[in-house]
């Protein structure tokens, strides 16, 4: 009888672990999507500061006159990504910028984001899992 009880407990534990793994993977992907949407809103609002007459944006770290300069945008984005966001796949770090636009998603870059000015558009790309890359473009005026 004891052997049967132990076997049943083992089976239940195995099923529970598999179900829990699927649940956490889905939650991480949803958190990465949420981060991406929040970044879109954040950078849209920051760019509007310049249109409304402010002189600086992105944590007061960039002059509005530099909003068309790619490396300035990337520097400001790096500051925000590492201080205000967490990578749901690597919870001990912020959301570091990854390489350049159009990067390929893989296990190593899940949850990472790239923010860059390209052709006077602020482009935000986030790897929400190991295959799916979300992209959004905000016109810079």
Where are these regions (language model features)?
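Alpha-helical interaction segments
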Residues: 9-13, 32, 75, 79
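Periplasmic/extracellular, small/polar-rich flexible segments of pilin-like filament-forming proteins
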Residues: 48-141
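Compositionally biased, intrinsically disordered low-complexity regions enriched in proline and serine
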Residues: 21-24, 37, 43, 72, ...
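Membrane-proximal N-terminal amphipathic helix
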Residues: 25-54
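N-terminal single-pass transmembrane signal-anchor helix
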Residues: 1-24
């Amino acid at each position: 009888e004891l052997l049967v009880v132990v076997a049943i407990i083992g089976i239940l534990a195995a099923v529970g672990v598999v179900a829990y793994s699927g649940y956490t993977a889905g939650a991480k992907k949803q958190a990465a999507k949420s981060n991406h949407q929040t970044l879109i809103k954040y950078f849209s609002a920051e760019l509007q500061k310049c249109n409304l007459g402010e002189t600086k944006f992105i944590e007061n770290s960039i002059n509005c006159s530099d909003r068309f300069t790619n490396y300035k945008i990337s520097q400001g984005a790096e500051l925000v990504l590492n201080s205000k966001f967490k990578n749901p796949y690597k919870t001990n770090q912020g959301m570091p910028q990854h390489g350049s636009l159009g990067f390929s998603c893989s296990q190593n870059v899940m949850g990472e984001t790239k923010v860059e000015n390209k052709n006077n558009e602020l482009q935000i790309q986030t790897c929400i899992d190991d295959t799916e890359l979300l992209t959004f473009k905000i016109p810079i005026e």
